[in-house]
Design a protein with these regions (language model features):
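Carbohydrate-binding surface patches
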Residues: 161-168, 689-714
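Acidic/histidine-rich catalytic neighborhood
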Residues: 444-501
Length: 739
């Protein structure tokens, strides 16, 4: 989508009247409807990684669901205390064949209402007299939602990109206009007797917060667990025939006060706020763009990149399952809105790299780095080892949460987290980051895995028990007595990446150590058809949502078609078996992941088909990934609709992989596009080595190919004309025109 931006041309007539116009730029990928959604998970999403808003209609009211990323109940899990809170105890129960105590401890006793992400509150405006909605549009370029009613009333709302506030500007609304602040119901009489289970907000045990009103100002204070609390405030004024409103959500963690944030915003006025808002979004969209001939794929891609910019920042907490769009239905969010490190957080950041949004990706890496101390404490306590292991399911602050122990407490989780440090280094060529963050993180992961694995008499390094998310669910046989391809690939990656980093830093002894450890690992388990098995003796002979057995192909890239016919055969056979076993028990994110793998295999048609299926079958009308097949057309037997974001962001990565790859050490443009895509272009996608690439395919021929070298160094790029590798030495800041 080609983007252009309009300058803000607001006329100031007093501070509050400075929003006479909030200029917007429509795009073909905007979300446009002639009504308001009637449920929260189909609402228009706005956010800035700190606070978020969902715009929809509940009954006769316009409803804005407000959220904040650090609204959390992080009470400790009592079941995770005691001498039996160790991996050795778990393994001993597996050895004895007595697994019920493990399920009892890590699931039944631990899966309570909290810890969990919690909702904020909602704002409601009575629109019963306003008549039908004429247009409801989310302007992606401007991160602004505009609603027009047939009677002439209108609202523009945006979540300020650089603050903890949201704005609403109404025109042509009645004198009776009012805003109500509606808090979540934390006190529901008879909740336990009603059988609401662990999903009811009432079971958190909070006192119902107090809503106070002084004129047009409404505030809400909610006490959470122990000393935690959060506040919501909204205030509005009439000015120049308009109603201008500001809301804020703050928490005791943030150290800010919602009412003060609202006061500061109103004093500044919407003109300046919107200018700063666009000061983020304009360069964000200029970071990269793609243009493909398939409108379905194009529109979904643009919507994913919009949500990515709304859900993460350099200094933000990472993207959780629902980010700043927590469920507004009176219940806890799906899977408690936590951080799932067995797939979800990792997939959510895939588009940061080729998509040229490394700063947005730093919100993830900075948080992981800041929690290293906590991970090391967990490693020592639970595994009894030095080094670094991280929980598979965790809270905002990195503490372990309940769940299936095979994946929530997997020893290789930290290796997958570590890959993101590796990717940031490779795509940024930032040697300071390598020295100060990336290598120390991977080094500690490798140190832990060196201890957690064992070397058998034949010299082979393995685990006593291994797993592969989420094969065999939470049963005892989900622990394999042989190393799975999932654990093998992650362990192999950790040692290989640590050795490469050590080499780059001139740490000869470290490099030799990690190479030795990696060299003791076996080769991948291969099935009778030549593809990757789940584990030795266990083929991928089922339909499963999590392609954990294929990690070596993508995202780890340990197996690559550029490495010769043997690896190409393994990759092709693995994908063939995935298709042969069918998608009965896939989720939406499975199709997104599949698109990335098909792209790595240079299967353009198959990659595009996976993306198209995701966009047509697994998203709600507002573009949210709903996990299940919403069309019930046989794309999955899962037809439910729990909203999670990882499928959305992995989708964006899938298209990026079709357009640009560099994992082999050689940059290749359009490596995996369908044959009928004759006119394709992209601008400023990022390759490894800190090379920024722009290219255009016209009538089936590459007519433009330019590479900007951020850091200098050796550029290797595959000529789209004759297939030879072009090698150039570049200077920092130099642009190389290939075609």
């Amino acid at each position: 989508m080609k983007r252009s931006f309009l300058l803000l041309t607001c006329i100031v007539t007093g501070c509050l009247c400075g929003c006479s116009k909030l200029e917007v730029q429509p795009s073909e990928s905007d979300l446009v409807f002639n009504d308001l959604a009637s449920v929260w998970d189909e609402a228009m999403p706005l956010g800035n990684a700190s606070v978020g808003e969902l715009v929809w209609q509940k009954g006769d009211n316009l409803r804005l669901s407000l959220d904040r990323i650090d609204l959390w109940d992080m009470r400790p899990i009592e079941a995770f205390k005691g001498e039996d809170y160790t991996f050795e105890w778990v393994k001993n129960q597996v050895r004895k064949g007595d697994y019920d105590p493990v399920v009892d401890k890590f699931e039944k006793k631990a899966y309570l209402a909290a810890p969990s992400k919690i909702p904020g509150a909602a704002l409601e405006i009575d629109i019963s007299s306003w008549g039908p909605v004429k247009e409801n549009r989310l302007y992606l370029d401007n991160a602004l939602c505009e609603v027009l009613w047939e009677n002439g009333a209108s609202m523009k709302t945006f979540v300020q990109a650089d603050g903890d506030v949201g704005w609403m500007v109404f025109e042509n609304v009645p004198e009776s206009f009012d805003i109500q602040l509606v808090p979540p119901e934390y006190q529901v009489k008879g909740a336990e007797e009603a059988g609401l289970g662990s999903s009811s907000l009432a079971l958190l045990g909070y006192p119902q917060g107090e809503v106070k009103r002084e004129g047009n100002r409404v505030t809400y204070h909610q006490q959470g667990w122990k000393d935690y609390f959060y506040d919501v405030a909204v205030d509005w004024k009439r000015a120049g025939g308009k109603v201008i409103a500001v809301w804020s959500v703050t928490s005791s963690i943030s150290g800010k006060k919602a009412a003060s944030e609202v006061d500061k915003a109103l004093a500044e006025g919407p003109k300046k706020a919107y200018k700063r808002h666009m000061g983020y979004w304009e360069p964000y969209w200029e970071g990269s763009s793609v243009n493909v001939p398939d409108a379905t794929i194009q529109h979904q891609y643009d919507r994913e990149m919009y949500k990515f910019g709304s859900a993460t920042r350099k200094d933000s907490y990472p993207i959780s399952l629902q980010s700043v769009w927590t469920a507004d239905d009176g219940f806890l969010p799906p899977w408690k809105g936590d951080y799932h490190n067995d797939l979800n957080t990792q997939l959510s950041y895939w588009p940061a790299y080729i998509g040229n949004h490394l700063d947005e990706g730093l919100g993830y890496l900075n948080t992981l780095w800041n929690q290293v101390g906590k991970y090391k404490e967990f490693t020592k306590k639970f595994f009894g080892k030095e080094g670094l292991a991280a929980p598979g399911y965790c809270t905002l602050e990195g503490d372990a949460m309940s769940g299936w122990v095979q994946y929530g407490f997997s020893p290789t989780t930290s290796a997958w987290l570590g890959q993101h440090f590796y990717l940031h280094w490779k795509y940024s060529a930032d040697n300071e980051f390598l020295k100060e963050r990336a290598y120390p993180f991977l080094r500690d992961v490798a140190l832990f895995l060196e201890q957690e694995t064992e070397v058998k008499p034949d010299g082979t390094r393995t685990f006593e028990y291994s797993s592969s998310p989420e094969i065999n669910d939470n049963r005892i046989d989900a622990f394999f007595p042989v190393i799975t391809n999932y654990d093998l690939a992650l362990t192999k990656f950790a040692f290989t990446a640590a050795a490469e980093m050590a080499d780059s830093l001139g740490l000869v002894d470290d490099s030799a150590r990690w190479k030795k450890d990696g060299g003791q690992l076996p080769y991948y388990a291969i099935d009778e058809d030549g593809g990757l098995s789940i584990a030795p003796g266990k083929s991928y002979d089922l339909s499963h949502r999590h392609f954990s057995h294929a990690m070596a192909i993508h995202p780890l890239g340990l197996l690559d078609i550029h490495n010769g016919p043997k690896e190409k055969t393994i990759i092709d056979a693995t994908l063939e078996r995935l298709h042969a076993n069918g998608p009965d028990w896939w989720c939406g994110y499975s199709y997104s992941w599949l698109a990335n793998m098909e792209a790595r295999a240079a299967h353009g048609e198959e990659a595009a088909e996976a993306l198209r299926t995701f966009a047509e079958c697994f998203v709600l009308r507002n573009s949210f990934h709903a996990n299940g097949d919403q069309t019930k057309s046989g794309k999955s037997q899962f037809t439910y609709r729990p909203f999670t974001l990882e499928g959305n962001f992995a989708y964006a990565s899938g298209l990026q992989e079709m357009l640009l790859q560099s994992q082999s050490g050689v940059i290749e443009v359009f490596p995996a596009i369908p044959k009928d895509w004759k006119n394709v272009s992209f601008n400023r996608l990022r390759a490894m080595g800190a090379f920024i690439v722009s290219a255009e395919l016209k009538d089936g021929k590459v007519v433009s190919l330019n590479v900007y070298s951020e850091k200098g160094g050796t550029l290797k790029i595959l000529s789209p004309i004759d297939g030879t590798v072009i090698t150039r030495q570049t200077r920092p800041g130099e642009t190389v025109r290939i075609i």
